[in-house]
């Protein structure tokens, strides 16, 4: 979600529409757990076919926004190493999350992936030169305590592997906004036209990331069992709605709301995800998973509140 948000402009024309967009994005993202569990394919096949459905969404949006300038925008985006590293991070996030969802519960997969802000806090200074304060350290500590709570109960071997993959997915997801911010930073001598084109780098990253995801899983998709009609429907929902539509709604919503409001509303995703899975498959998260996840969410949200509401220094 951070990927598209980084390209959003800060002018909020309609707050009510902003609330609707963010809620719609959270609802769309939350379909991942149930959808992935409902697709009887290997993780690689699921990633590849889901990416194929997401590709036209991002391609159309990029074309619609830049039209005749599309070749120049693509050349600029693909010429930057940050674009490729960010796209690889995005692809790994997709693959590791799908694998984690098949090896552990949906609650563990989504809530452990939600530790992504930890890595943003830890790497902001070395990558972007941003100072890390006491509130940042406390938020990181709270998140790691929450992760420890996840592992409090005895888990099966497959559960441990799934949790590890979910943690790696969170790390790669946390790297994504940092790389995108680096990719969008223009050279001091860059022209106004180049600066305008850099705004579309996040969409280029998403487009490239889904191309890579489709290619990585293509051998498994071509040699594995052919999906039935219901499976194709779920793949379409995951690609078009859970990836494509969700990112577009979030991008529109963050333009209209304060950061803390967007953060609060988007946090419905990890709560709704295991609820959908419970309704669809009867899979219930453990008490330790719920408690640890709530501590992670509380740490992330309190950090967002502190950052947004603290007094601004006088100019």
Question: Where are the regions a protein language model picked out?
Answer:
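Hydrophobic alpha-helical transmembrane segments of multi-pass integral membrane proteins
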Residues: 16-21, 45-64, 139-142, 165-168, ...
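Specific alpha-helical transmembrane segments that line the substrate/conduction pathway
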Residues: 48-56, 98-129, 169, 260-278
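Glycine-/small-residue-enriched transmembrane alpha-helix faces in small-molecule transporters
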Residues: 1-48, 96, 145, 155-190, ...
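Hydrophobic transmembrane alpha-helices of multi-pass small-molecule transport proteins
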Residues: 58, 132-152, 169-173, 210, ...
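Hydrophobic/aromatic residues within transmembrane alpha-helices
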Residues: 39, 46, 50, 100, ...
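Specific transmembrane alpha-helical segments of multi-pass solute transporters/efflux pumps
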Residues: 28, 65-107, 113, 149, ...
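Hydrophobic/small/kink-forming positions within alpha-helical transmembrane segments
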Residues: 30, 87, 91, 95, ...
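Helix-helix packing/entry segments at the starts of transmembrane helices
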Residues: 109-115, 183-184, 189-211, 243-279
């Amino acid at each position: 979600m951070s990927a598209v948000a980084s390209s959003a402009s800060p002018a909020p024309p309609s707050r009510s529409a902003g609330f609707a967009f963010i809620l719609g994005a959270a609802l769309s993202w939350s379909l991942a757990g149930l959808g992935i569990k409902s697709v009887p394919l290997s993780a690689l096949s699921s990633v590849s076919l889901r990416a194929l459905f997401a590709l036209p969404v991002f391609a159309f949006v990029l074309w619609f926004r830049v039209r005749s300038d599309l070749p120049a925008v693509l050349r600029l985006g693909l010429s930057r190493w940050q674009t490729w590293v960010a796209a690889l991070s995005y692809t790994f996030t997709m693959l590791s999350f799908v694998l984690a969802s098949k090896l552990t519960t949906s609650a563990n997969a989504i809530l452990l992936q939600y530790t992504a802000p930890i890595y943003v806090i830890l790497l902001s200074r070395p990558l972007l030169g941003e100072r890390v304060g006491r509130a940042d350290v406390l938020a990181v500590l709270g998140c790691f305590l929450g992760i420890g709570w996840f592992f409090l109960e005895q888990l099966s071997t497959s559960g441990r592997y799934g949790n590890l993959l979910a943690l790696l997915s969170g790390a790669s997801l946390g790297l994504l906004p940092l790389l995108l911010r680096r990719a969008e930073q223009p050279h001091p001598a860059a022209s106004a036209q180049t600066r305008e084109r850099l705004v579309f780098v996040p969409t280029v990253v998403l487009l490239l990331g889904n191309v890579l995801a489709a290619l990585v899983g293509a051998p498994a998709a071509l040699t594995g069992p052919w999906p039935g009609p219901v499976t194709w429907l779920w793949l379409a929902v995951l690609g078009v709605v859970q990836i494509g539509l969700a990112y577009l709604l979030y991008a529109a919503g963050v333009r209209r709301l304060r950061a803390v409001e967007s953060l609060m509303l988007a946090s419905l995703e990890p709560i709704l995800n295991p609820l959908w899975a419970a309704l669809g498959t009867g899979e219930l998260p453990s008490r330790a998973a719920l408690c640890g996840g709530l501590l992670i969410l509380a740490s992330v949200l309190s950090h967002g509140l502190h950052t947004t509401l603290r007094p601004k220094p006088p100019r």
